[in-house]
Amino acid sequence: MSKLIEYDETARRAMEAGVDKLAETVRVTLGPRGRHVVLAKSFGGPTVTNDGVTVARDIDLEDPFENLGAQLVKSVATKTNDVAGDGTTTATVLARALVKTGLRLVAAGINPIALGSGIGKAADAVSEALLASATPVSGKDAIAQVATVSSRDQLIGDLVGEAMSKVGHDGVVSVEESSTLGTELEFTEGVGFDKGYLSAYFVTDFDAQQAVLEDPLILLHQDKISSLPDLLPLLEKVAESGKPLMIIAEDIEGEALATLVVNSIRKTLKAIAVKSPYFGDRRKAFLQDLAAVTGAEVVNPDAGLVLREVGLEVMGSARRVVVSKDDTIIVDGGGAPEAVEARVNLLRSEIDRSDSEWDREKLGERLAKLAGGVAVIKVGAATETELKKRKESVEDAVAAAKAAVEEGIVAGGGSALIQARNALKDLRASLSGDEAVGVDVFSEALAAPLYWIATNAGLDGSVVVNKVSEVPAGHGLNAATLTYGDLAADGIVDPVKVTRSAVLNASSVARMVLTTETAIVDKPAEPEDDGHGHHGHAH
């Protein structure tokens, strides 16, 4: 296919226009008084959302060069969402501010490599300063506070706080749609682990990029599965049962994986294949944990259980399985409570007997997964559109709460970034030339999130930024009440992990745009003339 090429300033300006269009669309959602964006869907009703990454994912621009810029900033939002689960709009407006000011300076003759280096060093310094100023989070109320800020809903915040305090920091919180109008919390037997689906073709919920199976049969296999003849007899029995299938094994590859994928695409058998976590003996032990939770028997050729000879009697079950690209959650496993209890007691005694600190830590992880169970937040609403929006809010709140527990919190509302400018003074003094200018560019960009939070609340962004620059650390604008004060006392806090991810990802993509010298895109296909054009014929 033939290509279109743009060079130098023309390429960078086109990309900047794309960055601007995406950021301008996303920034309206920022802050407690942020607005909604309505997304038309090719099927079903429109989606109404104030979630930055949902808006960003939906944007593709007509001009291919502008679209390059938009896709780069979209990657900032997506990456921040993947790492921290929130902070996508903050990352987007930071990236836009860096690109806008940076390109103006590059056009004026500043060296883009040195400028980018200064921006990178400034981002690292701010990231370290945010970590150093973090307040640890523990306890139901503190977690609820973070979740409330993320979701802008006290009820959701309280539910997430209760869920996290019950299942523990490493526990699993699953979000489901409910058929009722209310949102409620329940605790069930279940387990989660850090492995995702082996093929994106297993995905059933394309918006959330998750594979979800209701009432599946679960096969646990100790070794690799690659041979189709070995797997086929069992697949046929599962297909006859009419239930979906989940396979957890050391690996699933070759013909076996290809067959599962083809069946999923054709919808002849809904299936998901997942690698079992850990290595060696720890993997074998964790499969036994899963066997207790699901009621399955681990298929192990060493113990005389051969895959091609087993039937449905070795299969476990669960009410629901949710698998993303990185995580698996098994909700309401079909195993007997006594079996889970026995497994928990065994793990506790192993922890007591172990001399190795590392072994004790890993056994403790498994114990937390087993004993904690799964907290399920069931989200209900009056309409399909409202339900989707509310479910998104709950998922963001859970992600924010987990991020807060991991690295602590700082004052929210964009003020932590304004106050992090102090960390750049020493760095600025130690650099010279265009690198030092990069630090100045970054310092100026740190005001962007607060500026837009204030603007969306109907205030003058520049005035608010100047005022917050002068208040004590931890103080700032509460955009919900339009007052200034101690933000932590008002419950306006952000997880450090979210803010740091936004800073580092925005800096990374801005440096890419600033140092771009050539942009190459596919030439758009000319619309075909089918010979039926209107040539002024009289009818």
From Swiss-Prot:
Task: List, as start-end ranges, the regions of compositional bias called Basic and acidic residues.
Answer: 523-533
Which family does the record assign? Belongs to the chaperonin (HSP60) family.
This protein's assembly is summarised as: Forms a cylinder of 14 subunits composed of two heptameric rings stacked back-to-back. Interacts with the co-chaperonin GroES.
Q: Which HAMAP family match?
A: CH60 (MF_00600)
Q: Name one GO molecular function term.
A: ATP binding
Lineage here is: Bacteria, Bacillati, Actinomycetota, Actinomycetes, Mycobacteriales
Listed GO cellular component terms?
Answer: cytoplasm
- What's its EC? 5.6.1.7
Q: Where does ATP bind?
A: T29, L30, G31, P32, D86, G87, T88, T89, T90, G413, N478, A479, A480, D494
**What name is this protein filed under?**
Chaperonin GroEL 1
Q: What class of enzyme is it?
A: isomerase
Q: Where in the cell is it found?
A: Cytoplasm
Catalyzed reactions per annotation: ATP + H2O + a folded polypeptide = ADP + phosphate + an unfolded polypeptide
Gene3D superfamilies, per the entry:
GroEL, GroEL-like equatorial domain, TCP-1-like chaperonin intermediate domain
| Record function comment | Together with its co-chaperonin GroES, plays an essential role in assisting protein folding. The GroEL-GroES system forms a nano-cage that allows encapsulation of the non-native substrate proteins and provides a physical environment optimized to promote and accelerate protein folding.
| Region annotation Disordered: where it falls in the sequence | 520-539
Per UniProt, the keywords (alphabetical) are: ATP-binding, Chaperone, Cytoplasm, Isomerase, Nucleotide-binding
Q: Which GO terms describe its biological process?
A: protein refolding
Q: Note the CDD domains from the entry.
A: GroEL
Among InterPro entries, the record links this protein to: Chaperonin_Cpn60_CS, Cpn60/GroEL, Cpn60/GroEL/TCP-1, GroEL-like_apical_dom_sf, GROEL-like_equatorial_sf, TCP-1-like_intermed_sf
Asked if the record carries the keyword Cytoplasm, the reply is yes
Q: Does the keyword Cytoplasm apply?
A: yes
